[in-house]
């Protein structure tokens, strides 16, 4: 015996392929475009419970998060988000506050932002991570997809890591940090992984491996609960899902629908492959790390590693082929239109590309970038 502690973690039973979405949004002052710490004031208009769908707060007081209920169809989950956002906008408008979403704010400074008070979880995180934790002025989209058996969680997670650079590049929306162009499509990706419990998951094969890891990490005081692991893709045992968290925040419901459809189709296909007794694809951990960096740095111009053999392709070309392959699955799940929206992102550019174009058209000024992000979100709501 090696003396390691295995912590039994029950994986909730969830109808397969049901999807839920969490969308983090920034509150900005309508006049200046600066971040505004008004989320606590906005949230007073919403009930304080975890019923789905719901609106909640986040780490910083400048952020609200809208959370859908789980649905079999992506479109229904997105409808939840749209209804919630409409309600948030109705509360924020009289305050002179707009909503925007991107992986980072183009120019607001992190020292000026306030951490949500009276939250033990956030206080513990900040006490442990200090300077790096204080800088987490970032926003993302999280997509949950249900799987019916926890034994499938790690094989599917490892197979999803093969697709992580596609997720990263398609959603990349954080080219700026504190008023500077970073040269990265997703500066958020590299910021977030500075936290000791964030970033890529470790190399695990079975649910027992995961339980042993959680037991070890709890035993040595790294975490108190498995929910404190903020991996790019992680099991969510409480909900019976795999949660893809790598996405930068995106500003339109259409893009969210497309990204969610992509994940739903992949999880559905991979789960079916396991049912057929097939071995799922996975890549060497250093390939996964390299792919994440390439996608964060170059976005849609990244040449990504496609498989364990080291074959490479431009992420846009690779993504087009993937969408075509998944089309029958999308048709069966009722999300074919949403999945094909991925091709629109490839054709018109991811958010970081659109932001850079706006900055260039305005001689490098970044206030118009915030205006652009606000308008993208509002236009997606039909406002």
From Swiss-Prot:
Its EC number is 6.3.2.2. Keywords: ATP-binding, Ligase, Nucleotide-binding. InterPro entries: GCL_type2/YbdK_subfam, GCS2, Gln_synth/guanido_kin_cat_dom, YbdK. Pfam families: GCS2. It comes from the Bacteria. GO terms for biological process: modified amino acid biosynthetic process. GO terms for molecular function: ATP binding; glutamate-cysteine ligase activity. It catalyses: L-cysteine + L-glutamate + ATP = gamma-L-glutamyl-L-cysteine + ADP + phosphate + H(+). ATP-dependent carboxylate-amine ligase which exhibits weak glutamate--cysteine ligase activity. HAMAP family: Glu_cys_ligase_2. Belongs to the glutamate--cysteine ligase type 2 family. YbdK subfamily. PANTHER family: GLUTAMATE--CYSTEINE LIGASE 2-RELATED. This is Putative glutamate--cysteine ligase 2. It comes from Clavibacter sepedonicus.
